[in-house]
Amino acid sequence: MSQLYQRHFLRLLDFIPDEINGLLKLASRLKATKKKGDETQYLKGKNIALIFEKDSTRTRCSFEVAAFDQGANVTWLGPSGSQIGHKESIKDTARVLGRMYHAIQYRGHGQQLVESLAEHAGVPVWNGLTNEFHPTQLLADLLTMQEHLPEKTLNQMTLAYVGDTQNNMGNTLLEAAALVGLDLRLVAPKSCWPDPALVAQCRDVAQQTGGKITLTEDIAAGVQGADFIYTDVWVSMGEPKEVWHERITLLRPYQVNMALLQATGNPQVKFLHCLPAFHDDQTLLGQQMAQQYDLHGGMEVTDEVFESAHSVVFDQAENRLHTIKAVMVATLSQQE
């Protein structure tokens, strides 16, 4: 993976298919060595800044544990721990941190912010999530798919993403499908489809890799024959309550339940979710949603599906660690 040394990791379309497949192989190898307890530390003495303008569980833990496993040191800068965009520009922050750290992770708002960090830092910058893209999540998703369907290569797999497909997950799934040749179906109301320009761009790339990208409102047609069903939350914290009502009303027919899994015609279909999920009423927000919108069986996914043998969401969550570690090792060391 020496070709990725000192590279940024901002969005998947910055890479070619061989580079993405190389990262997945590296992640699988790093996972195996960690499980055996004989992991080689490639990042001893490296210092890494973790900027979180949005709260996180999986992303923060994955970056921190990956760094510690590899012998690196981290500094966590939370929403109140830096002056980015308030008293200091992103450009100036990048130039300061680039003098002190070997790499910078950014999880926050607009993609232009992480792009600006990368432009000015002089060290590798990794996108932990922006409003537009979530590339580290997709690496974990692809590794999970390979592990749970080893008899197929990625370009032989079919994935249906059901629900709100115009978010950062929908965008990044498009890019992933184009690069690795997935048969991707985005199953959603037309008003929840992604930006047509991005769809066109990804379809152009998919022509070279054998990928197929379909957008449809037809749930039965969209999930037929799928190897994986994927969904994400319908609403986000901070959105107005009026938006919640509109979104839930619009997307209720697209809930992932057992009937939808059965509609795939594939008894071995697996369920993916990037988490957190509103699958029950065991959280304060889940209770509020259940009472207000009569969603006692779950929102975007039912508890029955989430807790079933179809669900591989916790393997998926664990793989955040191994794939993020692969990005760190590939961009900060020259080992093959």
Curated annotation (Swiss-Prot):
Keyword Plastid applies: no
Pathway assigned in UniProt: Amino-acid biosynthesis; L-arginine biosynthesis; L-arginine from L-ornithine and carbamoyl phosphate: step 1/3
Subcellular location: Cytoplasm
One record GO biological process: L-arginine biosynthetic process
Signal peptide: none
Residues that hold carbamoyl phosphate according to the record: 56-59, 83, 107, 134-137, 274-275, 320
Pfam family membership, one: OTCace
Binding residues for L-ornithine: 168, 232, 236-237
Keywords tagged on the record: Amino-acid biosynthesis, Arginine biosynthesis, Cytoplasm, Transferase
Gene Ontology cellular component terms for the protein in this record: cytoplasm
One function term, GO molecular function aspect: amino acid binding
Stored InterPro entries: Asp/Orn_carbamoyltranf_P-bd, Asp/Orn_carbamoylTrfase, Asp/Orn_carbamoylTrfase_sf, Asp_carbamoyltransf_Asp/Orn-bd, Orn/put_carbamltrans, OTCase_ArgI
EC code(s) of this entry: 2.1.3.3
Keyword Transferase: yes
Function recorded in the entry: Reversibly catalyzes the transfer of the carbamoyl group from carbamoyl phosphate (CP) to the N(epsilon) atom of ornithine (ORN) to produce L-citrulline.
NCBIfam families xref list: orni_carb_tr, PRK12562.1
Family: Belongs to the aspartate/ornithine carbamoyltransferase superfamily. OTCase family.
Protein name as catalogued: Ornithine carbamoyltransferase
Source organism of this protein record: Erwinia tasmaniensis (strain DSM 17950 / CFBP 7177 / CIP 109463 / NCPPB 4357 / Et1/99)
